[in-house]
């Protein structure tokens, strides 16, 4: 997989989920087995806004400088690893239904893919 393809995939995942959380927070939260209240709707929309920002960063990183791309990868490794831990804890505790495992796979893909490009593809970052 190329660096550009990886960024395209994670950008689309973030943007689609972000739009869903902003526009349809009750439905998206319900699909993850979460009860909705005014508070959860607000947090879901804030999460969606953050995902929209991340999606745009990933999209722009497709053509970014190697220093910018490396920084995005490092931030993605950290953020997605923390997200993975949180979603696994929530799913195993029963706070999220089995859709939590889908979110876990998305976080794992982002962290592992970013780690791959940082560790194994450092020359590609400079010669893109």
What are these regions (language model features)?
Residues 2-3, 67-69, 95-98:
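Membrane-helix interface segments
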Residues 63, 85-102, 119:
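Membrane-helix boundary connector in multi-pass membrane proteins
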Residues 57-69, 91-92:
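Juxtamembrane helix-break-helix junctions at the cytosolic face
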Residues 1-13:
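Cytosolic juxtamembrane helix and N-cap/initiation of the first transmembrane helix
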Residues 22, 59, 88, 112-118:
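Membrane-embedded alpha-helical segments of multi-pass transporters/permeases
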Residues 26-38, 90-96:
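Membrane-interface helix termini and inter-helical loops of multi-pass transporters
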Residues 109-128:
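Membrane-water interface at the C-terminal end of transmembrane alpha helices
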Residues 12, 16-22, 40-63, 74-85, ...:
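Core segments of alpha-helical transmembrane spans in multipass integral membrane proteins
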């Amino acid at each position: 997989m190329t660096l550009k393809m990886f960024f395209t995939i994670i950008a689309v995942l973030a943007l689609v989920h972000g739009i869903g959380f902003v526009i349809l927070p009750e439905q998206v939260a319900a699909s993850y087995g979460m009860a909705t209240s005014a508070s959860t709707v607000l947090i879901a929309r804030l999460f969606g806004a953050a995902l929209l920002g991340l999606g745009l960063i990933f999209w722009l990183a497709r053509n970014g400088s190697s220093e910018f791309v490396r920084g995005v990868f490092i931030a993605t490794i950290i953020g997605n690893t923390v997200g993975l831990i949180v979603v696994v804890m929530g799913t195993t505790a029963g706070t999220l239904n089995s859709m939590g495992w889908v979110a876990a796979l998305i976080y794992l893909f982002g962290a592992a893919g970013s780690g791959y490009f940082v560790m194994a593809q450092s020359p590609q970052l400079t010669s893109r």
